[in-house]
A protein has these predicted regions:
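Conserved active-site and cofactor/substrate-binding residues in soluble primary-metabolism enzymes
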Residues: 22, 26, 57, 61, ...
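Non-catalytic terminal extensions of PLP-dependent enzymes
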Residues: 1-84, 88-92, 334, 343, ...
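Glycine- and acidic
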Residues: 12-13, 70-78, 104-111, 139, ...
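Active-site C-terminal subdomain of aminotransferase-like
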Residues: 236-354, 359-364, 437-441, 445-448, ...
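Active-site-adjacent bridging/hinge elements
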Residues: 59-68, 91-102, 245, 282-287, ...
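Conserved N-terminal alpha-helix of the aminotransferase class I/II PLP-enzyme fold
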Residues: 67-116, 126, 130
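Predominant activation on well-ordered alpha-helical scaffold segments within soluble catalytic domains
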Residues: 63, 87-92, 121-128, 153, ...
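Conserved PLP-enzyme active-site core in the AAT-like
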Residues: 7, 85, 111-297
Length: 461
């Protein structure tokens, strides 16, 4: 059975527009079957990231809010003024959490986008337009640590911005700020720091980067897409988490995904600005169109009111107390799982992570551990250079017994890896780096395989 098309033999494949419609009941029955089977992949708590809440009651509550506004286009605020309430209050709650009140010389603002990559794209667009209008920069560049998300590479590719990749300290996995300072120039429009980075769960030296940004006069974007809605609660709980938000002078934008640790539905994120004027630099206007005067705050035109309503409902139903409670359980579980990793001399954590961690081995290929644990139901995210396994701890992992099961299975996996260390790992070809480093030929082959995979995912069998 194809992993891409597992339902081919059980459900009809729609190969063209049906001549007659099916009954709604039959359609919903099919959907319920698929959903029930797919939920099993994460309900056990063995799946890294992906499902951040895992509470079906919370999902049902947000679905109730969603369906009330699912048909509404928030572009038309005269018909749905509620969208301004939802959007404005989502932004206000996010700015409150990120200490927008620490800003006194400008007016903080925000933009609700469709996800983390979209927030990053809008941030890079805002910096490009601001630099063009106010600094006369026509050939802009951005500097990011090599660990910063691939969305920055995508955004710079789409926007025609040169991207420079700074190395990290291999011991701490944090950005090399001295390298950034040396390679920034008069055309640098922004630098990037992660809080935390996706790969290792470590936080870049944001305060040091903020001082550099102020000294050199460019922006500092903090990518909190993953950590933005949990690290603030970790700070409040007393964990040793460095400053990364608007309390740091020099931080000009922060991305934080409401569809991750704010526990909203997929399809929303917030881009927070220290200065509303920077947000205005990425607005779009067309005043002489035959269809009338047109404007949009971001790249999207039409958007469903359902996602705004559901996100707003989810955030206001949890409140500070709810978020703190969930964060406490997640941090405690993450550190228990990290302790299980550190119990094995052959394994080591990458840097000093918090709720999200990655581990590797200098004794054997870590993908031997993955080979053993995947049949047990564990789904890690694979890393490369060096090969490593990543676990973003979410609410499903906080269920009773999950951390203990992780420790027990990991111990057996390490024994397995010791016994098979002279053999190639089975999953290394899927996740791991190319031995000896990437070559042009290997890069071209991998791109071809990925393109075929994406074509398959958008086709029918």
């Amino acid at each position: 059975m194809s992993s891409t098309y597992p339902y081919t033999e059980r459900f009809d494949v729609v190969r063209g527009m049906p001549s007659e419609g099916r009954s709604r009941r039959a359609i919903l029955d099919d959907l319920a079957t698929m959903a029930s089977e797919e939920d099993k992949a994460w309900e056990s708590g063995q799946c890294s990231g992906t499902m951040y809440c895992g509470d079906h009651d919370h999902y049902a509550f947000m679905a109730d809010a969603f369906k009330l506004f699912a048909h509404v286009n928030v572009l038309q605020r005269d018909i749905c003024p509620s969208a301004s309430k939802f959007e404005g209050e989502i932004i206000a709650m996010t700015l409150d959490m990120l200490h927008g009140d620490a800003v006194h010389d400008t007016t903080p603002a925000g933009l609700v986008t469709s996800g983390g990559s979209d927030s990053i794209l809008h941030a890079m667009y805002a910096y490009r337009e601001h630099a063009r209008q106010h600094r006369g920069i026509e050939r802009p560049n951005v500097i990011k640590p090599e660990t910063a998300h691939a969305a920055f590479d995508k955004a710079c590719h789409l926007l025609g911005i040169e991207l420079r990749r700074a190395p990290i300290d291999p011991a701490t996995t944090r950005a090399d700020v001295a390298w950034i300072a040396e390679h920034a120039d008069a055309d640098t429009i922004a630098i990037v720091g992660s809080a935390c980075n996706y790969g290792y769960g470590t936080i870049d030296p944001i305060e040091e980067m903020g001082r550099l940004a102020l000294e050199r006069g460019f922006g500092l974007h903090v990518d909190g897409c993953l950590g933005g809605f949990i690290l603030p609660w970790g700070q409040e709980l007393g964990y040793d988490i460095p400053l990364f938000d608007f309390r740091v002078p020099g931080v000009t934008t922060i991305s934080a995904d409401t569809h991750k640790y704010a526990y909203g539905f997929k399809g929303t994120s917030v881009l927070a600005f220290r200065d509303i004027d920077l947000r205005r630099d990425q607005y779009f206007f067309l005043t002489d169109w035959s269809g009338g005067k047109y404007c949009s705050p971001g790249i999207a035109g039409s958007r469903s009111g359902g996602l705004l309503a559901a996100t707003w409902a989810g955030m206001t139903s949890l409140g500070r107390e709810g978020y703190l409670g969930y964060a406490k359980a997640i941090f405690e579980t993450s550190f228990a799982m990290q302790d299980a990793v550190e119990a094995h001399p052959e394994l080591r954590l990458m840097g000093e992570p918090t709720f999200c961690f990655s581990f590797t081995s200098d004794e054997f290929d870590i993908y031997h551990v993955n080979d053993f644990m995947r049949p047990r139901g564990w789904r890690f995210n694979g890393q490369q250079y060096p090969n490593a396994l990543h676990m973003a701890v979410t609410r499903p992992q906080t269920q009773e017994g999950v951390a203990d099961a992780f420790a027990a299975d990991l111990a057996e996996a390490v024994d397995y890896a010791r016994q098979h260390k002279d053999e190639p790992a089975k999953s290394g070809a899927i996740y791991g780096g190319v031995a000896g480093g990437m070559t042009n030929e290997a890069d071209e082959f991998i791109r071809s395989v990925m393109a075929d995979m994406m074509d398959e995912q958008q086709a029918i069998p």
